[in-house]
């Protein structure tokens, strides 16, 4: 451990470290209004301020003359204001045109809906503008670039940070405040052990913070970002692992043994496990049979890759060991499907099981409770209902959670608490890039199944515009003529629902506050139900959405499974778990509203039987600007059926939290890590976190306490679960 952690000796540097926790109100230049503005940005402490890094830089070391600035490229140009003209080409459209000149030419700059700029600038002002250079009407032009008035005598070879600011704090004042904060903090003790900094070739924390805000070169900025990204990843890995292990310090892991139930279950399966499935199961079996540690494993698999069969094998191992297992799913639909598909296999293997949901009748619920407490039941399938205080197991040794990201951490821990020392297996059919899995599931060992054990008929995907709607209706009619069924997916439930309740997806223009700024017709299930009943007479069409009572949802899904409904108009409630092999067509309205991973999950509902499926993604994109980008993104669905490839594309375009649904259920937002480019760095942080905790399981020693404190400060919301806060 001595190689990893050096004991701090300089008390002054600890005092400077504590300065990071000081309230921003104590900083120089932070007045009442500026304090309010900073707090609106989520900045409450000096540490928050220093982690509020620039989102771009004005690089005067690489500025261009107007003549040499390349067209189609984002450039920084330093020039002088020659003329300012305000125009109003149409109602509510104000344009401020600024002509900039240097010794080589003229640059026409247009600012839209920013009339105050005319009051901020005057002829003769020296500006630095950064934006994309275009050419039209004989002049080079920029549209709404970022600009900075240069102070008299400013050196041309500097780099200016550009922060996100709020009313009450200008860019200039933000720089002054950040500079003052860096002075207050000085050169604090670095929580990351010196051994790791040398091993990973990282600059110190203090230097990284200075360099990320005020770099002398963009290369220095990149080195600083690398240090802060590693720090972010390491802290997150440690926080997640400490949280996961915090309640397990005094428990004794259970050493399972495989036996007759497992052998019988494998015989009952309609197919042999594929090589990938077998590797994943052996990972799980090794963990379950290890009496020295509790299993914490993520089983990650694309749609139809057979995760359920692997999980069933784990359930059999628990039964072979004379203990119980619980499978928790996010919806009653999915829990019932697990019971319907897996239950008969368990019965053939000599295991007893039951299903418990919110809709379970009281008498049945009492019977299940009694069988659990007596040990008569081997496996319980259920929803959040299994978390009820009156659900008690005789000996719960395995917890399986499906679609982990749809549950809060507290729910996961509550179920696990019903069996101290229970192994944990979480599963998801949402393809997640490896870097993202290592980051946000850093507390879990990962097994991946990429390919289907039994190749299905497949799905053909086409992206259609509104003008091709007849093709979509024709596909539904053709499927119906063959005795097959269809889904129509809408982003909204009712016409009154707000567009701004939806996730922010590339391709839709929004203003700075996230509001939709272009008129995009949004489809809702209520209106679509009426429209389809008119367009497709003679077909039985019903709708399904998450606001329906559980019993009503079950009724509709059962009717669809029995073939009594021809077309199901639904929200994304069918994204996970609805398995109707006779459904062969899916039409997704407003495809630009969904991420690639979600679209891939949705299309996985068709083509599940012996007949190939058709997925038609409707878009209102017109082929220009952001709409063109949205259409390009959607067309990648036509080119690949690999969910992991699509997830990697999604990661480049969207926030990691949007892929996993973390806006409601998650722990983290990664501000420094580039999940697409930092794979090696993320791997380092993962390995280093494991090594640190191997030698100091709680980071509570004198040598590691500063690191633990830094982790607790950065990820308070995660770490408080370790201390019981």
Predicted regions and their residues:
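Short, surface-exposed secondary-structure boundary micro-motifs
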Residues: 80, 132-133, 239, 591, ...
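Inter-lobe coupling/hinge segments of SF2-like helicase ATPases
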Residues: 290-635, 698
């Amino acid at each position: 451990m001595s190689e990893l952690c050096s004991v701090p000796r300089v008390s002054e540097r600890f005092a400077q470290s504590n300065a990071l926790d000081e309230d921003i109100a104590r900083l120089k230049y932070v007045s009442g209004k500026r304090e309010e503005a900073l707090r609106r940005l989520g900045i409450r402490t000096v540490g928050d301020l220093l982690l509020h890094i620039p989102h771009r830089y004005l690089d005067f070391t690489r500025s261009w003359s107007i003549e040499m600035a390349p067209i189609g490229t984002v450039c920084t140009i330093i020039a002088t204001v020659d003329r300012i003209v305000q125009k109003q080409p149409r109602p509510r459209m104000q344009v401020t045109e600024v002509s900039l000149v240097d010794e080589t030419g003229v640059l026409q700059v247009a600012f839209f809906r920013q009339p105050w700029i005319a009051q901020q600038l005057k002829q003769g002002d020296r500006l630095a503008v950064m934006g994309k250079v275009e050419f039209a009407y004989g002049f080079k032009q920029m549209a709404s670039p970022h600009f900075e008035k240069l102070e008299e005598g400013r050196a041309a070879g500097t780099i200016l940070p550009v922060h996100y600011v709020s009313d009450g704090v200008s860019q200039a004042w933000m720089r002054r405040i950040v500079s003052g904060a860096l002075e207050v903090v000085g050169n604090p003790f670095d929580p990351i052990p010196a051994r790791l900094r040398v091993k990973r070739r990282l600059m110190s924390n203090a230097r990284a913070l200075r360099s990320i805000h005020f770099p002398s070169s963009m290369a220095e900025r990149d080195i600083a970002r690398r240090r802060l990204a590693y720090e972010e990843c390491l802290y997150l890995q440690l926080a997640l692992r400490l949280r996961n292990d915090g309640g397990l310090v005094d428990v004794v892991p259970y050493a399972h043994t495989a036996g007759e139930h497992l052998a019988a279950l494998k015989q009952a399966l309609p197919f042999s496990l594929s090589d990938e499935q077998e590797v994943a199961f052996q990972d799980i079996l090794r963990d379950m049979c290890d009496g020295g540690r509790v299993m914490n494993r993520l089983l990650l698999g694309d749609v139809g890759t057979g995760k359920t069969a692997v999980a069933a094998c784990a359930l059999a191992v628990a039964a072979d060991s004379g203990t119980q297992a619980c499978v928790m799913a996010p919806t009653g639909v999915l829990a019932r499907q697990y019971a319907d598909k897996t239950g008969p296999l368990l019965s053939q293997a000599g295991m007893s099981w039951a299903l418990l949901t919110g809709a379970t009748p009281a008498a049945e619920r009492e019977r299940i409770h009694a069988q659990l407490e007596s040990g008569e039941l081997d496996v319980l399938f259920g929803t959040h209902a299994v978390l009820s205080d009156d659900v008690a197991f005789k000996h719960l040794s395995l917890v399986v959670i499906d679609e982990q990201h749809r549950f809060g951490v507290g729910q996961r821990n509550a179920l696990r608490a019903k069996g101290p020392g229970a192994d944990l297996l979480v599963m998801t059919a949402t393809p997640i890039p490896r870097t993202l899995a290592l980051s946000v599931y850093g507390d879990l060992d990962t097994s991946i199944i990429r390919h289907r054990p039994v190749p299905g008929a497949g799905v053909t995907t086409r992206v259609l515009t509104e003008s091709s709607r007849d093709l979509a209706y024709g596909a539904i009619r053709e499927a119906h003529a063959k005795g097959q069924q269809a889904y129509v997916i809408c982003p909204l439930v009712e016409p009154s629902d707000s567009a701004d309740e939806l996730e922010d997806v590339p391709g839709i223009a929004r203003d700075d506050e996230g509001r939709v700024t272009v008129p995009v017709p949004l489809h809702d299930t209520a209106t679509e139900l009426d429209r389809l009943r008119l367009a497709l007479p003679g077909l039985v069409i019903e709708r399904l959405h998450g606001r329906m009572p559980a019993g009503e949802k079950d009724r509709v899904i059962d009717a669809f499974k029995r073939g009594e409904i021809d077309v199901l108009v639904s929200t994304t409630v069918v994204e996970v778990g609805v398995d109707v092999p006779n459904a062969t067509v899916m039409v997704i309205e407003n495809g630009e509203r969904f991420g690639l991973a979600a679209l891939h999950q949705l299309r996985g509902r068709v083509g599940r039987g012996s007949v190939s499926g058709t997925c038609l993604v409707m878009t209102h994109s017109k082929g220009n600007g952001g709409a063109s980008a949205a259409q390009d993104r959607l067309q990648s669905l036509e080119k690949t059926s690999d969910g992991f490839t699509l997830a990697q594309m999604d990661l480049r375009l969207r926030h990691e939290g949007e892929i996993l649904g973390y806006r409601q259920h998650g722990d983290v937002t990664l501000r420094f890590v580039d999940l697409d480019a930092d794979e090696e760095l993320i791997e380092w942080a993962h390995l280093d976190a494991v090594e640190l905790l191997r030698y100091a399981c709680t980071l509570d020693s004198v040598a590691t306490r500063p690191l633990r404190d830094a982790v607790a400060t950065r990820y308070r919301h995660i770490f408080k679960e370790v201390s019981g806060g």
